């Protein structure tokens, strides 16, 4: 007789197969609609366990740079619809709505910046510059995957043996993090990820807070940056290095350098501070095993704002035992509108969030699996099982 664990595993496997089927159908339909020149830009080599040959698939960004692939603006409207169908296949309804809103925020940001920001292209803030690429043959016997990314969005999916096996790194950002709408409620795409974390930290007693709060000020960015592989001791990356290639225009290089330097100076961090919040194999902060029932409910709700980005059954199921392995770390004040950062880290889990730039109105959030981002683990196993 099947146990509950067996039934849950079977249900998750079925969900991952159904999602892979939807992805394959959507990817094939999009590729079939492209002309040869578009298709050449839209496709890449099949995923591989070899880091060198798989390097492009493992490259990701969250800055307004070329993320690799065919840009939305280089597609006809009917092709764009098919592209968004593929994007939606890898997201929950709430996840898709959030991504669509983030893309539209580039129009809002253009207004905030006075329509004058120049990134060396025709339009500095451009919702047409989100890029989609398919790696390998959708639905084929070999592993395949797809990536969608642009300013403040990065989605990375891998399918092996007809099953979705990786959905990380998964990055959502928002600039502005809060902007006015008609009526009393502002537009805040990442409100849940910020408000639930603040509520959780503010619920801690003095002893818990002393362990959770690493510093009274926040770093300028997420600590892991856009690294393909995370390592013990990783520290914040300078803004100019989170772009594809080097800036050919000295003026743009100077602009990005000054922006990064300004963010770093505003953080007030010195070398010891960076070391304090550096990534580590042993999680920093407060073990959540000691949280009370109400606090654990808050933590689960917070985790859902990350793990709920993808369709049901694709994110890891964190039972009580898995939850007990998570640590909560916070840096910065806890007041509304103040720069802050937090991290949730446990086995096969790293979540980072910061809202520090633009006077704490520019947020970054990322969900990662340090051991298996991009499907490192399953690609190696697939290679061993199917090749001499």
Where in the sequence are the language-model features?
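A cross-kingdom marker for long, charged
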Residues: 2-8, 13-36, 40-74, 81-92, ...
């Amino acid at each position: 007789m099947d146990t509950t664990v067996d039934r849950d595993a079977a249900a998750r496997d079925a969900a991952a197969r159904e999602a892979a089927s939807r992805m394959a159908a959507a990817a094939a339909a999009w590729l079939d609609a492209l002309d040869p020149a578009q298709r050449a830009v839209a496709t890449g080599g099949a995923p591989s366990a070899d880091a060198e040959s798989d390097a492009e698939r493992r490259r990701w960004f969250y800055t307004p740079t070329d993320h690799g692939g065919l840009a939305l603006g280089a597609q006809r409207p009917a092709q764009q619809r098919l592209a968004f169908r593929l994007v939606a296949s890898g997201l929950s309804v709430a996840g898709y709505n959030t991504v669509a809103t983030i893309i539209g925020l580039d129009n809002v940001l253009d207004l905030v910046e006075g329509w004058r920001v120049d990134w060396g292209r025709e339009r500095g803030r451009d919702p047409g510059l989100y890029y989609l690429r398919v790696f390998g043959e959708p639905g084929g016997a070999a592993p395949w995957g797809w990536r969608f990314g642009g300013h403040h969005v990065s989605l990375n999916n891998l399918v092996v043996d007809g099953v979705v096996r990786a959905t990380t790194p998964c990055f959502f950002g928002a600039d502005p993090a809060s902007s006015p709408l008609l009526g009393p409620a502002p537009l805040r795409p990442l409100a849940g990820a910020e408000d639930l974390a603040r509520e959780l930290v503010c619920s801690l007693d003095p002893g818990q807070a002393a362990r959770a709060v690493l510093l009274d000020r926040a770093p300028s960015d997420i600590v892991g940056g856009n690294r393909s592989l995370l390592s013990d001791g990783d520290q914040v990356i300078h803004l100019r290095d989170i772009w594809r290639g080097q800036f050919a225009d000295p003026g743009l290089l100077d602009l990005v350098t000054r922006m990064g330097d300004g963010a770093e100076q505003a953080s007030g961090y010195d070398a010891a501070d960076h070391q304090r919040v550096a990534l580590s194999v042993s999680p920093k902060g407060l073990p959540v095993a000691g949280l009370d029932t109400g606090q654990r409910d808050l933590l689960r709700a917070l985790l859902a704002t990350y793990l709920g980005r993808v369709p049901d059954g694709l994110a890891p199921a964190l039972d009580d035992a898995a939850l007990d392995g998570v640590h909560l770390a916070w840096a910065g004040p806890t007041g509304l509108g103040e720069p802050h950062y937090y991290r949730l880290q446990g086995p096969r889990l790293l979540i980072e969030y910061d809202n520090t730039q633009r006077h704490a109105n520019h947020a970054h959030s990322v969900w990662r699996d340090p051991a298996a981002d991009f499907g490192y683990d399953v690609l190696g196993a697939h290679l061993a099982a199917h090749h001499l």
